[in-house]
Amino acid sequence: MKRLPLILLLLTTALTASADRVKVRLFANHTIDRIYISFDLGTYDLIADDTTNLASAMGEGKSVELYPDGKYVHVAVDGLTYGRFKSVSFLANDTACILCLNPYNIKNRTYEGNLIVTVNKGGKLQLVNDVEFETYIAGVVQSEIYGDQTDIFRVQAIISRTWALRNINKHKAEGYNFCDHVHCQAYLNRCVRPDIMLGTIQSSGQTIVDSAGNLIETPFHSNSGGETANSEDVWRSALPYLRSVPDTFSYHMRQSEWVKVLSEEKWMNYFANRHHLDIHDDSIRHELLTFTQSSRKVRICDVPLTRIRNDFQLKSTFFNVLYDSAAHRVTLSGHGYGHGVGLSQEGTIRMVGLGISYDSIIRHYYTGAQIQYDTEHPHTYVENYIQQITRIIEEDKNAVTRTKSKKDDWLGRLFRLRDREEREEVYDPNNADLDTDWQYDW
Protein backbone atom coordinates (compact mmCIF):
# COMPACT_ATOMS: atom_id res chain seq x y z
CA MET A 1 0.00 0.00 0.00
CA LYS A 2 1.21 3.51 -0.78
CA ARG A 3 2.47 5.84 1.93
CA LEU A 4 -0.29 8.43 1.53
CA PRO A 5 -3.20 6.13 2.51
CA LEU A 6 -1.20 4.93 5.52
CA ILE A 7 -0.60 8.49 6.66
CA LEU A 8 -4.32 9.18 6.20
CA LEU A 9 -5.08 6.27 8.51
CA LEU A 10 -2.64 7.57 11.11
CA LEU A 11 -4.42 10.90 10.94
CA THR A 12 -7.65 9.06 11.69
CA THR A 13 -5.89 7.40 14.63
CA ALA A 14 -5.23 10.89 16.00
CA LEU A 15 -8.97 11.55 15.78
CA THR A 16 -9.79 8.56 17.93
CA ALA A 17 -7.11 8.52 20.60
CA SER A 18 -9.52 9.23 23.47
CA ALA A 19 -12.91 8.45 21.88
CA ASP A 20 -15.41 5.75 22.73
CA ARG A 21 -16.43 3.09 20.26
CA VAL A 22 -19.79 2.74 18.55
CA LYS A 23 -21.47 -0.06 16.64
CA VAL A 24 -22.95 0.78 13.23
CA ARG A 25 -25.04 -1.57 11.13
CA LEU A 26 -23.74 -1.54 7.55
CA PHE A 27 -25.79 -1.95 4.35
CA ALA A 28 -28.88 -1.42 6.50
CA ASN A 29 -31.13 -0.72 3.51
CA HIS A 30 -29.81 -3.68 1.51
CA THR A 31 -30.40 -7.43 1.62
CA ILE A 32 -27.08 -9.24 2.00
CA ASP A 33 -27.14 -12.87 0.80
CA ARG A 34 -23.40 -13.24 0.30
CA ILE A 35 -20.32 -11.14 0.96
CA TYR A 36 -16.58 -11.37 0.41
CA ILE A 37 -14.22 -9.80 2.94
CA SER A 38 -10.64 -8.88 2.07
CA PHE A 39 -7.94 -6.96 3.90
CA ASP A 40 -6.62 -3.63 2.62
CA LEU A 41 -4.30 -2.85 5.52
CA GLY A 42 -3.10 -4.55 8.68
CA THR A 43 -4.13 -7.97 9.97
CA TYR A 44 -7.26 -9.39 11.55
CA ASP A 45 -8.09 -12.39 13.71
CA LEU A 46 -11.16 -14.36 12.62
CA ILE A 47 -13.21 -15.32 15.67
CA ALA A 48 -16.30 -17.55 15.67
CA ASP A 49 -19.02 -17.43 18.37
CA ASP A 50 -16.89 -14.98 20.41
CA THR A 51 -14.39 -17.66 21.51
CA THR A 52 -13.14 -19.87 18.68
CA ASN A 53 -10.11 -18.53 16.81
CA LEU A 54 -10.58 -19.70 13.23
CA ALA A 55 -7.56 -17.83 11.85
CA SER A 56 -4.95 -15.39 13.12
CA ALA A 57 -3.26 -12.42 11.49
CA MET A 58 -5.20 -12.57 8.25
CA GLY A 59 -3.96 -9.88 5.89
CA GLU A 60 -3.54 -8.79 2.30
CA GLY A 61 -4.17 -11.60 -0.19
CA LYS A 62 -6.67 -13.47 1.97
CA SER A 63 -10.37 -13.61 1.11
CA VAL A 64 -13.25 -14.69 3.35
CA GLU A 65 -16.63 -15.69 1.92
CA LEU A 66 -19.71 -15.48 4.14
CA TYR A 67 -23.32 -16.42 3.47
CA PRO A 68 -26.35 -17.37 5.60
CA ASP A 69 -27.02 -21.06 6.23
CA GLY A 70 -30.24 -21.22 8.22
CA LYS A 71 -29.57 -19.33 11.45
CA TYR A 72 -25.82 -19.64 10.99
CA VAL A 73 -23.05 -17.89 9.07
CA HIS A 74 -21.21 -20.15 6.64
CA VAL A 75 -17.48 -19.33 6.54
CA ALA A 76 -14.97 -20.13 3.80
CA VAL A 77 -11.41 -18.80 3.60
CA ASP A 78 -9.74 -18.84 0.18
CA GLY A 79 -12.34 -21.37 -0.95
CA LEU A 80 -11.84 -23.72 2.01
CA THR A 81 -14.92 -24.21 4.23
CA TYR A 82 -14.29 -23.52 7.93
CA GLY A 83 -17.81 -24.33 9.16
CA ARG A 84 -20.94 -22.46 10.17
CA PHE A 85 -21.36 -20.35 13.28
CA LYS A 86 -23.85 -18.09 15.07
CA SER A 87 -21.50 -15.13 14.79
CA VAL A 88 -18.25 -14.32 13.05
CA SER A 89 -16.00 -11.44 14.11
CA PHE A 90 -13.07 -9.79 12.37
CA LEU A 91 -10.92 -8.27 15.13
CA ALA A 92 -8.23 -5.77 14.13
CA ASN A 93 -4.76 -6.37 15.53
CA ASP A 94 -3.82 -2.68 15.38
CA THR A 95 -5.39 0.75 14.96
CA ALA A 96 -4.13 0.85 11.36
CA CYS A 97 -6.40 -1.84 9.90
CA ILE A 98 -8.84 -1.64 6.99
CA LEU A 99 -11.40 -4.17 5.75
CA CYS A 100 -12.87 -4.25 2.24
CA LEU A 101 -16.50 -5.41 2.11
CA ASN A 102 -17.73 -6.70 -1.24
CA PRO A 103 -21.38 -7.85 -1.12
CA TYR A 104 -22.84 -9.60 -4.14
CA ASN A 105 -24.34 -7.07 -6.59
CA ILE A 106 -23.54 -4.05 -4.36
CA LYS A 107 -20.64 -1.62 -4.67
CA ASN A 108 -17.80 -2.53 -2.33
CA ARG A 109 -16.91 -0.36 0.68
CA THR A 110 -13.96 -0.08 3.06
CA TYR A 111 -14.13 0.39 6.82
CA GLU A 112 -11.76 0.61 9.77
CA GLY A 113 -12.19 -1.16 13.09
CA ASN A 114 -13.83 -4.51 13.78
CA LEU A 115 -16.67 -6.29 12.00
CA ILE A 116 -19.31 -8.59 13.53
CA VAL A 117 -21.44 -10.73 11.20
CA THR A 118 -24.60 -12.61 12.20
CA VAL A 119 -27.82 -13.80 10.54
CA ASN A 120 -30.86 -11.61 11.19
CA LYS A 121 -34.47 -12.68 11.72
CA GLY A 122 -35.07 -12.48 7.99
CA GLY A 123 -32.37 -15.07 7.31
CA LYS A 124 -29.94 -12.56 5.77
CA LEU A 125 -26.48 -11.44 6.84
CA GLN A 126 -26.26 -8.56 9.29
CA LEU A 127 -22.96 -6.66 9.40
CA VAL A 128 -22.00 -4.37 12.27
CA ASN A 129 -18.90 -2.17 12.28
CA ASP A 130 -17.37 -1.74 15.76
CA VAL A 131 -15.43 1.48 15.28
CA GLU A 132 -13.96 4.45 17.13
CA PHE A 133 -16.54 7.22 17.53
CA GLU A 134 -14.55 9.99 15.81
CA THR A 135 -13.65 7.68 12.92
CA TYR A 136 -17.38 7.12 12.50
CA ILE A 137 -18.01 10.89 12.53
CA ALA A 138 -15.41 11.48 9.80
CA GLY A 139 -17.07 8.78 7.68
CA VAL A 140 -20.46 10.42 8.21
CA VAL A 141 -19.15 13.82 7.16
CA GLN A 142 -17.70 12.36 3.96
CA SER A 143 -21.03 10.65 3.21
CA GLU A 144 -23.31 13.58 4.06
CA ILE A 145 -21.84 16.72 2.46
CA TYR A 146 -19.77 17.86 -0.50
CA GLY A 147 -17.32 20.76 -0.63
CA ASP A 148 -13.69 21.74 -0.73
CA GLN A 149 -13.10 23.91 2.35
CA THR A 150 -12.28 22.59 5.79
CA ASP A 151 -14.82 24.68 7.71
CA ILE A 152 -17.64 23.04 5.72
CA PHE A 153 -16.58 19.71 7.18
CA ARG A 154 -16.03 21.22 10.60
CA VAL A 155 -19.64 22.42 10.74
CA GLN A 156 -20.97 19.06 9.53
CA ALA A 157 -18.79 17.21 12.06
CA ILE A 158 -20.15 19.30 14.94
CA ILE A 159 -23.80 18.73 14.03
CA SER A 160 -23.22 15.03 13.24
CA ARG A 161 -21.38 14.51 16.54
CA THR A 162 -24.15 16.29 18.44
CA TRP A 163 -26.82 14.15 16.81
CA ALA A 164 -24.90 10.94 17.47
CA LEU A 165 -24.31 11.68 21.15
CA ARG A 166 -27.94 12.67 21.66
CA ASN A 167 -29.17 9.53 19.87
CA ILE A 168 -26.48 7.11 20.99
CA ASN A 169 -29.05 4.42 21.91
CA LYS A 170 -31.26 4.77 18.83
CA HIS A 171 -30.86 1.09 17.89
CA LYS A 172 -29.97 -0.27 21.32
CA ALA A 173 -32.73 -2.89 21.17
CA GLU A 174 -31.18 -4.30 17.97
CA GLY A 175 -27.72 -4.56 19.52
CA TYR A 176 -26.01 -1.61 17.84
CA ASN A 177 -25.99 2.20 18.08
CA PHE A 178 -26.75 3.42 14.56
CA CYS A 179 -27.50 2.24 11.06
CA ASP A 180 -25.58 3.57 8.06
CA HIS A 181 -28.63 4.97 6.25
CA VAL A 182 -30.38 8.35 6.45
CA HIS A 183 -32.66 6.90 9.15
CA CYS A 184 -29.66 7.73 11.34
CA GLN A 185 -26.76 9.31 9.42
CA ALA A 186 -25.24 8.16 6.15
CA TYR A 187 -21.99 6.23 6.75
CA LEU A 188 -21.13 4.78 3.37
CA ASN A 189 -17.37 4.30 3.64
CA ARG A 190 -14.40 5.07 5.82
CA CYS A 191 -13.16 8.62 5.42
CA VAL A 192 -10.40 8.81 2.81
CA ARG A 193 -10.13 12.59 2.37
CA PRO A 194 -7.53 14.43 4.47
CA ASP A 195 -9.42 17.73 4.33
CA ILE A 196 -12.48 16.08 5.88
CA MET A 197 -10.30 14.49 8.56
CA LEU A 198 -8.78 17.87 9.30
CA GLY A 199 -12.21 19.46 9.64
CA THR A 200 -13.29 16.68 11.98
CA ILE A 201 -10.16 17.10 14.09
CA GLN A 202 -10.77 20.86 14.30
CA SER A 203 -14.20 20.18 15.74
CA SER A 204 -12.99 17.61 18.27
CA GLY A 205 -14.89 17.91 21.55
CA GLN A 206 -17.39 20.40 20.13
CA THR A 207 -21.15 19.89 20.37
CA ILE A 208 -24.21 22.16 20.19
CA VAL A 209 -26.29 22.78 23.31
CA ASP A 210 -29.33 24.83 24.31
CA SER A 211 -29.46 27.49 27.02
CA ALA A 212 -29.69 24.77 29.68
CA GLY A 213 -26.58 23.01 28.39
CA ASN A 214 -28.47 20.07 26.87
CA LEU A 215 -27.54 18.58 23.52
CA ILE A 216 -29.96 19.77 20.86
CA GLU A 217 -31.49 17.99 17.91
CA THR A 218 -29.46 19.00 14.85
CA PRO A 219 -31.53 18.25 11.74
CA PHE A 220 -30.06 19.33 8.43
CA HIS A 221 -31.11 19.25 4.80
CA SER A 222 -29.56 19.89 1.39
CA ASN A 223 -31.01 23.33 0.63
CA SER A 224 -33.62 25.51 2.37
CA GLY A 225 -34.72 27.29 -0.80
CA GLY A 226 -34.18 30.66 0.87
CA GLU A 227 -35.98 30.15 4.18
CA THR A 228 -35.74 27.39 6.78
CA ALA A 229 -38.83 25.85 8.41
CA ASN A 230 -40.07 25.74 11.99
CA SER A 231 -39.79 22.28 13.53
CA GLU A 232 -43.52 22.10 14.32
CA ASP A 233 -44.36 22.83 10.68
CA VAL A 234 -42.70 19.55 9.68
CA TRP A 235 -42.85 17.45 12.85
CA ARG A 236 -44.89 17.69 16.05
CA SER A 237 -42.61 19.47 18.50
CA ALA A 238 -41.94 23.20 18.53
CA LEU A 239 -38.29 23.54 19.58
CA PRO A 240 -36.95 27.01 20.43
CA TYR A 241 -33.70 26.49 18.53
CA LEU A 242 -35.38 25.22 15.34
CA ARG A 243 -37.02 28.44 14.13
CA SER A 244 -37.64 29.59 10.58
CA VAL A 245 -34.94 32.02 9.45
CA PRO A 246 -34.23 33.80 6.14
CA ASP A 247 -31.51 31.98 4.23
CA THR A 248 -30.44 33.81 1.08
CA PHE A 249 -27.18 31.84 1.26
CA SER A 250 -29.06 28.87 -0.21
CA TYR A 251 -29.88 30.73 -3.43
CA HIS A 252 -28.09 29.84 -6.68
CA MET A 253 -26.78 26.47 -5.48
CA ARG A 254 -27.15 22.97 -6.96
CA GLN A 255 -30.42 22.21 -5.19
CA SER A 256 -31.88 25.72 -5.08
CA GLU A 257 -34.73 25.11 -7.52
CA TRP A 258 -36.77 22.28 -8.96
CA VAL A 259 -39.77 21.77 -11.24
CA LYS A 260 -42.41 19.05 -11.45
CA VAL A 261 -45.10 19.02 -14.17
CA LEU A 262 -48.46 17.30 -13.64
CA SER A 263 -51.68 17.12 -15.57
CA GLU A 264 -54.50 19.25 -14.21
CA GLU A 265 -56.55 16.10 -13.80
CA LYS A 266 -53.94 14.31 -11.70
CA TRP A 267 -53.39 17.35 -9.46
CA MET A 268 -57.08 18.04 -8.84
CA ASN A 269 -58.13 14.41 -8.48
CA TYR A 270 -55.44 13.92 -5.86
CA PHE A 271 -57.16 16.41 -3.57
CA ALA A 272 -60.60 15.03 -4.37
CA ASN A 273 -59.73 11.37 -3.81
CA ARG A 274 -57.03 11.57 -1.15
CA HIS A 275 -58.33 14.51 0.91
CA HIS A 276 -62.02 14.59 -0.04
CA LEU A 277 -62.04 18.21 -1.19
CA ASP A 278 -64.82 19.56 -3.39
CA ILE A 279 -62.65 20.53 -6.35
CA HIS A 280 -65.66 22.05 -8.11
CA ASP A 281 -65.96 24.71 -5.41
CA ASP A 282 -64.65 27.94 -6.97
CA SER A 283 -62.63 29.06 -3.95
CA ILE A 284 -60.99 25.65 -3.49
CA ARG A 285 -60.24 25.31 -7.19
CA HIS A 286 -58.77 28.82 -7.27
CA GLU A 287 -56.44 28.12 -4.32
CA LEU A 288 -55.30 24.79 -5.70
CA LEU A 289 -54.39 26.32 -9.06
CA THR A 290 -52.87 29.64 -7.89
CA PHE A 291 -51.13 28.65 -4.64
CA THR A 292 -47.96 30.67 -3.96
CA GLN A 293 -45.45 30.99 -1.12
CA SER A 294 -43.46 34.20 -0.81
CA SER A 295 -42.53 32.78 2.59
CA ARG A 296 -43.04 29.24 3.83
CA LYS A 297 -46.60 28.06 4.43
CA VAL A 298 -47.78 24.89 6.12
CA ARG A 299 -50.99 23.96 4.27
CA ILE A 300 -52.91 24.37 1.04
CA CYS A 301 -56.70 24.10 1.46
CA ASP A 302 -55.96 22.74 4.95
CA VAL A 303 -53.94 19.85 3.49
CA PRO A 304 -50.43 19.61 5.05
CA LEU A 305 -47.72 20.37 2.52
CA THR A 306 -45.61 17.63 4.09
CA ARG A 307 -48.21 15.07 3.01
CA ILE A 308 -48.28 16.45 -0.54
CA ARG A 309 -44.50 16.32 -0.68
CA ASN A 310 -44.49 12.69 0.39
CA ASP A 311 -47.28 11.60 -1.95
CA PHE A 312 -45.80 13.28 -5.03
CA GLN A 313 -42.17 12.65 -3.98
CA LEU A 314 -41.34 16.35 -4.21
CA LYS A 315 -37.94 17.72 -3.26
CA SER A 316 -39.49 20.14 -0.75
CA THR A 317 -42.74 21.68 0.51
CA PHE A 318 -41.60 25.14 -0.63
CA PHE A 319 -43.28 25.50 -4.03
CA ASN A 320 -45.67 27.63 -6.11
CA VAL A 321 -48.39 26.34 -8.43
CA LEU A 322 -48.40 27.60 -12.03
CA TYR A 323 -51.50 26.70 -14.02
CA ASP A 324 -51.60 26.51 -17.82
CA SER A 325 -55.32 26.41 -18.66
CA ALA A 326 -54.73 25.94 -22.39
CA ALA A 327 -52.57 22.86 -21.84
CA HIS A 328 -54.55 21.69 -18.77
CA ARG A 329 -51.20 21.42 -17.01
CA VAL A 330 -49.95 22.28 -13.53
CA THR A 331 -46.30 23.13 -12.91
CA LEU A 332 -44.94 22.98 -9.37
CA SER A 333 -42.07 25.46 -9.24
CA GLY A 334 -40.12 24.61 -6.13
CA HIS A 335 -37.26 25.85 -3.98
CA GLY A 336 -34.75 23.84 -1.97
CA TYR A 337 -34.30 20.16 -1.22
CA GLY A 338 -35.25 18.44 2.02
CA HIS A 339 -37.49 19.06 5.02
CA GLY A 340 -36.09 22.55 5.52
CA VAL A 341 -35.58 22.35 9.30
CA GLY A 342 -32.25 23.32 10.85
CA LEU A 343 -29.05 23.68 8.86
CA SER A 344 -28.94 24.05 5.09
CA GLN A 345 -25.86 22.25 3.82
CA GLU A 346 -25.60 24.28 0.63
CA GLY A 347 -26.23 27.44 2.62
CA THR A 348 -23.30 26.39 4.79
CA ILE A 349 -21.10 25.84 1.73
CA ARG A 350 -21.95 29.32 0.49
CA MET A 351 -21.36 30.95 3.88
CA VAL A 352 -17.97 29.32 4.29
CA GLY A 353 -17.08 30.55 0.80
CA LEU A 354 -17.95 34.08 1.92
CA GLY A 355 -15.63 33.78 4.92
CA ILE A 356 -18.33 33.48 7.59
CA SER A 357 -17.05 31.62 10.65
CA TYR A 358 -18.18 28.10 11.51
CA ASP A 359 -19.72 29.18 14.85
CA SER A 360 -21.68 32.01 13.20
CA ILE A 361 -23.06 29.52 10.68
CA ILE A 362 -24.25 27.20 13.45
CA ARG A 363 -25.85 30.06 15.39
CA HIS A 364 -27.61 31.24 12.22
CA TYR A 365 -29.37 27.93 11.68
CA TYR A 366 -29.90 26.88 15.32
CA THR A 367 -31.52 29.87 17.04
CA GLY A 368 -30.07 30.65 20.47
CA ALA A 369 -27.90 27.54 20.53
CA GLN A 370 -24.28 27.57 21.64
CA ILE A 371 -21.21 25.51 20.82
CA GLN A 372 -19.89 23.64 23.81
CA TYR A 373 -16.27 22.52 24.03
CA ASP A 374 -15.48 19.51 26.19
CA THR A 375 -12.66 21.01 28.27
CA GLU A 376 -12.29 17.79 30.27
CA HIS A 377 -11.05 16.01 27.16
CA PRO A 378 -9.12 18.61 25.11
CA HIS A 379 -7.82 17.37 21.80
CA THR A 380 -4.08 16.63 21.69
CA TYR A 381 -1.92 14.61 19.33
CA VAL A 382 -0.81 11.62 21.37
CA GLU A 383 2.84 10.60 21.52
CA ASN A 384 2.15 7.31 19.77
CA TYR A 385 0.74 9.16 16.77
CA ILE A 386 3.79 11.45 16.61
CA GLN A 387 6.12 8.46 16.69
CA GLN A 388 4.29 6.74 13.84
CA ILE A 389 4.38 9.84 11.65
CA THR A 390 8.06 10.34 12.47
CA ARG A 391 8.83 6.75 11.50
CA ILE A 392 7.17 7.23 8.11
CA ILE A 393 9.21 10.38 7.54
CA GLU A 394 12.42 8.51 8.31
CA GLU A 395 11.48 5.56 6.07
CA ASP A 396 10.48 7.63 3.08
CA LYS A 397 11.96 11.11 2.75
CA ASN A 398 9.92 11.66 -0.42
CA ALA A 399 6.74 11.64 1.66
CA VAL A 400 7.61 15.07 3.04
CA THR A 401 8.97 16.71 -0.10
CA ARG A 402 7.26 20.11 -0.31
CA THR A 403 5.86 20.92 -3.74
CA LYS A 404 3.08 23.16 -4.95
CA SER A 405 0.57 20.30 -4.90
CA LYS A 406 -2.16 20.52 -2.29
CA LYS A 407 -1.57 16.97 -1.10
CA ASP A 408 2.01 17.79 -0.16
CA ASP A 409 0.76 21.01 1.43
CA TRP A 410 -1.58 19.22 3.83
CA LEU A 411 1.22 16.81 4.75
CA GLY A 412 3.31 19.83 5.65
CA ARG A 413 0.49 21.10 7.86
CA LEU A 414 0.38 17.76 9.65
CA PHE A 415 4.07 17.91 10.38
CA ARG A 416 3.81 21.48 11.68
CA LEU A 417 1.04 20.31 14.00
CA ARG A 418 3.29 17.48 15.12
CA ASP A 419 5.98 20.01 15.97
CA ARG A 420 3.42 22.13 17.82
CA GLU A 421 2.49 19.10 19.93
CA GLU A 422 6.14 18.42 20.73
CA ARG A 423 6.32 21.97 22.11
CA GLU A 424 3.45 20.90 24.43
CA GLU A 425 1.00 23.38 22.94
CA VAL A 426 -2.55 22.06 23.38
CA TYR A 427 -4.78 22.51 20.36
CA ASP A 428 -7.75 24.76 21.18
CA PRO A 429 -10.44 24.67 18.46
CA ASN A 430 -11.75 28.06 19.63
CA ASN A 431 -8.43 29.77 18.92
CA ALA A 432 -8.87 32.00 15.85
CA ASP A 433 -5.17 31.99 14.98
CA LEU A 434 -5.03 28.22 14.83
CA ASP A 435 -8.23 28.21 12.78
CA THR A 436 -6.56 30.42 10.20
CA ASP A 437 -3.50 28.18 10.12
CA TRP A 438 -5.71 25.15 9.57
CA GLN A 439 -7.74 26.52 6.67
CA TYR A 440 -7.30 24.12 3.79
CA ASP A 441 -8.75 24.41 0.30
CA TRP A 442 -8.57 20.83 -1.01
Predicted regions and their residues:
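Conserved, single-site charged/polar hotspot
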Residues: 4-7, 11, 17-442
